[in-house]
Structures are given as structure tokens and as C-alpha cells.
Amino acid sequence: MGDVEKGKRIFIMKCSQCHTVEKGGKHKTGPNLHGLFGRKTGQASGFTYTEANKNKGIIWGEDTLMEYLENPKKYIPGTKMIFVGIKKKEERADLIAYLKKATNE
């Protein structure tokens, strides 16, 4: 898959303004991502999601995140995530490798 350290840098630059990853981390503009892998869309406890997120009904994993992170608004029309996405597949793979580790510690 990707490079965890490169993924961490991508997370800090592009994601950390709106998301946290640590267990017990607070929700910001976006939800805390701890426990993301294997969870259905729109299920982080204590965060208010759009109906689009709640109704998407997919399980987060490497493949679903790879597609989602390329263009979030295309993958889940109606999401309130304003991030435009990451076009480079390698950067998405690095970010996913980091998220897989960081959201499970």
C-alpha cells in the first residue's frame, strides 16, 4: 500500500484542520476518524452527518477510501465535507496507509 510517514504529512497538511484520529479525539468541523476502518458511513458517535452520508451505506476500507478521497462530493453527493479531494493515487495510498495505522491505535 502506501507510505505511512508520507501519509501523516498529507493528513497534517490537508485533513487535520477538520479531523482528529486519536482514540477519544474531539470532533472538529469533521468527525474524529478513530475506528474508521470497518465502520459504515455516517456512524461516528456524537457527530451530526448529512442524510447523504448516513444513507450511503458503504463500509470504510482501503478501496472505498481510495475512491472517496479522489472526489468526496462525487462519491457522496450531499456530503458536507468541503475538501476537493486528492487526485494523485499515490498520495491517496499514503494517506490511507497512515489512516489505517493512526485510527486503530
Curated annotation (Swiss-Prot):
Q: Does the keyword Aminoacyl-tRNA synthetase apply?
A: no
Give the protein family.
Answer: Belongs to the cytochrome c family.
Q: How is it modified after translation?
A: Binds 1 heme c group covalently per subunit.
Question: Which top-level group of life is the source organism from?
Answer: Eukaryota
Could you tell me the gene encoding this protein? CYCS
According to its UniProt entry, this protein's organism is: Ateles sp.
Could you state one GO cellular component term attached to this entry?
A: mitochondrial intermembrane space
The protein's name is: Cytochrome c
Q: Which UniProt keywords apply?
A: Acetylation, Apoptosis, Electron transport, Heme, Iron, Metal-binding, Mitochondrion, Phosphoprotein, Respiratory chain, Transport
Q: Name one GO molecular function term.
A: metal ion binding
- Gene Ontology terms: biological process: apoptotic process
Binding positions (heme c): C15, C18, H19, M81
InterPro entries reported in the protein's UniProt record: Cyt_c-like_dom, Cyt_c-like_dom_sf, Cyt_c_1A/1B
Q: What does this protein do?
A: Electron carrier protein. The oxidized form of the cytochrome c heme group can accept an electron from the heme group of the cytochrome c1 subunit of cytochrome reductase. Cytochrome c then transfers this electron to the cytochrome oxidase complex, the final protein carrier in the mitochondrial electron-transport chain. Plays a role in apoptosis. Suppression of the anti-apoptotic members or activation of the pro-apoptotic members of the Bcl-2 family leads to altered mitochondrial membrane permeability resulting in release of cytochrome c into the cytosol. Binding of cytochrome c to Apaf-1 triggers the activation of caspase-9, which then accelerates apoptosis by activating other caspases.
Modified residue Phosphotyrosine is at which positions?
Y49, Y98
What subcellular locations does the record give?
Mitochondrion intermembrane space
Report the residues modified as N6-acetyllysine: K73, K100
Please report a single Pfam family linked to this protein: Cytochrom_C
